[in-house]
């Protein structure tokens, strides 16, 4: 089903990444009804790309964006998150902030994190996951902060900017 992010956890997420939202391009992956991306838009994000494969959740999301007048700054993609990440490296590189809130499916979470890790460039990635989940080893994404709320853990990863290879 559709899992709205609980209010307390959502509040905590925005307390952790507040300053990074302004003018950022945001990816809301496994978006569901889009609670995290919509909140980011309301806090000054330049734009949000919502990606999910569930038709029902996306219908609700589109309706919410319409009612709130946020369609102009939104792009809704219906599709498999991991495949989309692998097929859209430019859009991933442009993102300054990524919300990753998959159904508690460890395999999908790890695949999405690894796909993000391959293209991560000057980005903050916020992952909501079960406290039982062991994070995979990642090359670029480094754990910045972690908060626990019952059985849910919010992990914030950061990846530094990729150094340009041009020499003066």
Predicted regions and their residues:
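Class I S-adenosyl-L-methionine-dependent methyltransferase catalytic core
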Residues: 1-168
